[in-house]
Regions:
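Short coil/turn motif common to extracellular beta-sandwich-like domains
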Residues: 38-47
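Short acidic/polar inter-strand loop motif in beta-rich domains
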Residues: 69, 95-103
C-alpha cells in the first residue's frame, strides 16, 4: 500500500512539474551588454529572446521608461535610432493581449558617449 501511495504522489508531482515549467516567462537581452558604452552616431541593435509564458502575449521595448516599439517575435532584434549622449535604460517587458505588463522584464543600462570621448 505504501508503494502505491508513493507511486501516486510521484505521478501527480510528475504531471504538475511540466505545467509549472510551461508557465515560466523570461526575457533575455543578449546585446548590447549591461553597462555597454556606445558611440553617439551608431544605431543600437537590441538582440533579444522571449518566453512569454501563459500570461504573456508579446513584448514592449522601452528606453528611459518611454515605449519605443512593440515586439511580436519571440526571438529577434530591433534597431534603435541613435541615442543622446548620457546614460540610458533599455527594457523589454512581456505584456498581455491588453498591453498590460505581466511583471516579467529585463533591463540593461548603457552609456552613450560623444565621438570626441573616444
Amino acid at each position: 500500500m505504501r508503494t502505491l501511495k508513493s507511486l501516486v504522489i510521484l505521478l501527480a508531482f510528475g504531471c504538475y512539474v511540466p505545467l509549472v515549467l510551461a508557465d515560466d516567462a523570461s526575457v533575455i537581452i543578449s546585446s548590447p551588454a549591461d553597462g555597454a558604452k556606445l558611440g553617439r552616431t551608431a544605431q543600437t541593435k537590441i538582440n533579444y529572446e522571449v518566453m512569454p509564458g501563459s500570461k504573456g502575449d508579446h513584448t514592449h521595448l522601452y528606453v528611459d521608461d518611454k515605449e519605443v516599439a512593440v515586439l511580436r517575435q519571440l526571438k529577434g532584434s530591433h534597431t534603435l535610432e541613435s541615442l543622446a549622449p548620457g546614460k540610458h535604460e533599455i527594457c523589454i517587458k512581456i505584456v498581455s493581449k491588453g498591453h498590460t505588463p505581466i511583471g516579467v522584464q529585463q533591463c540593461i543600462k548603457v552609456s552613450v558617449e560623444d565621438q570626441n570621448d573616444y
